[in-house]
Amino acid sequence: MKDMKTIEGIIVVTTPEIPGYKVVEVKGVARGGTVRATHIGRDIMALLRNLKGGEVKEYTEMMAEAREEALRRMALHAKELGANAVVNFRFATSNLGGSMAEIYAYGTAVVVERVEK
């Protein structure tokens, strides 16, 4: 697996298969999530940006960090399940009210082996 990008040592792909590998065991659903809330400083900056239009960089950065954390937690959960890969990886988001949002990463934790050519 040295030629593939991994997260916490786990191959993570959005596809049902990994080229050059075969699934030999399904371990279950791997998942990881995080809830993020804004703070008054970000809210003020966002309000000012909203007045003139355009991207709200403070929120974009916060959500990017949240996605990376959810992805890392999902990979760690897959490792706990005994997997070395996650296939069919997806993100989900939900608004928890006010200025809080949940980012959830999930996929199928599997054990894969390299296919000999």
Swiss-Prot record:
This is UPF0145 protein PH1682. InterPro entries: UPF0145_dom_sf, UPF0145_YbjQ-like. The lineage of its organism: Archaea, Methanobacteriati, Methanobacteriota, Thermococci, Thermococcales. It comes from Pyrococcus horikoshii (strain ATCC 700860 / DSM 12428 / JCM 9974 / NBRC 100139 / OT-3). Belongs to the UPF0145 family. Pfam families: YbjQ_1. Gene3D superfamilies: Hypothetical protein apc22750. Chain B.
